[in-house]
């Protein structure tokens, strides 16, 4: 039984078996943590999915791990700020709707008071 992707095809994408194992493990963890896949998979297991991506060349070892780490930190910070801004917009919309509702109620009470006189 031939395993797909083959070890030869995989080793064409990385420098060594060690690098392959490390890349596979890291990518499998990313996929488990809901990182966006780069393709449709034949395999069900995350480790085999990672190997499929490596064989296709869509996942590579980052040349500067520190830079990748910084990029991830920046990405997470940006996502956090975007979520905070979205939350703030929702709060502002709620406050605006509450103010409009309060104004309608005031106008309604004023109209009733004027009609009663």
Swiss-Prot record:
It catalyses: RNA(n) + a ribonucleoside 5'-triphosphate = RNA(n+1) + diphosphate. Gene3D superfamilies: 3.90.940.10. Residues 108-117 have a biased composition (Low complexity). GO terms for molecular function: DNA binding; DNA-directed RNA polymerase activity. This is DNA-directed RNA polymerase subunit omega. The RNAP catalytic core consists of 2 alpha, 1 beta, 1 beta' and 1 omega subunit. When a sigma factor is associated with the core the holoenzyme is formed, which can initiate transcription. Its EC number is 2.7.7.6. Transmembrane segments: none annotated. One of its GO terms (cellular component) is DNA-directed RNA polymerase complex. InterPro entries: DNA-dir_RNA_pol_omega, Pol_omega/Rpo6/RPB6, RPB6/omega-like_sf. Residues 96-105 have a biased composition (Basic and acidic residues). Residues 96-117 are annotated as: Disordered. One of its GO terms (biological process) is DNA-templated transcription. It comes from Lactococcus lactis subsp. cremoris (strain MG1363). Keywords: DNA-directed RNA polymerase, Nucleotidyltransferase, Transcription, Transferase. Belongs to the RNA polymerase subunit omega family. Promotes RNA polymerase assembly. Latches the N- and C-terminal regions of the beta' subunit thereby facilitating its interaction with the beta and alpha subunits. It holds the Pfam family RNA_pol_Rpb6. It is an enzyme of class 2 (transferase).
């Amino acid at each position: 039984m031939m395993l797909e992707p083959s070890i030869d095809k995989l080793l064409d994408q990385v420098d060594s078996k060690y690098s392959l194992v490390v890349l596979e493990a890291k990518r499998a963890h990313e996929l488990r943590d809901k990182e966006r896949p780069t393709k449709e998979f034949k395999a069900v297991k995350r480790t085999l999915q990672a190997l499929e991506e490596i064989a296709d060349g869509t996942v590579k070892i980052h040349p500067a791990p520190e830079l990748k780490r910084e990029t991830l930190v920046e990405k997470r910070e940006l996502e956090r700020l975007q979520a905070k801004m979205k939350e703030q917009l929702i709060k502002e919309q709620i406050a605006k709707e509450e103010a409009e509702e309060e104004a309608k109620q005031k106008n309604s009470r004023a109209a009733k008071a004027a009609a009663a006189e």
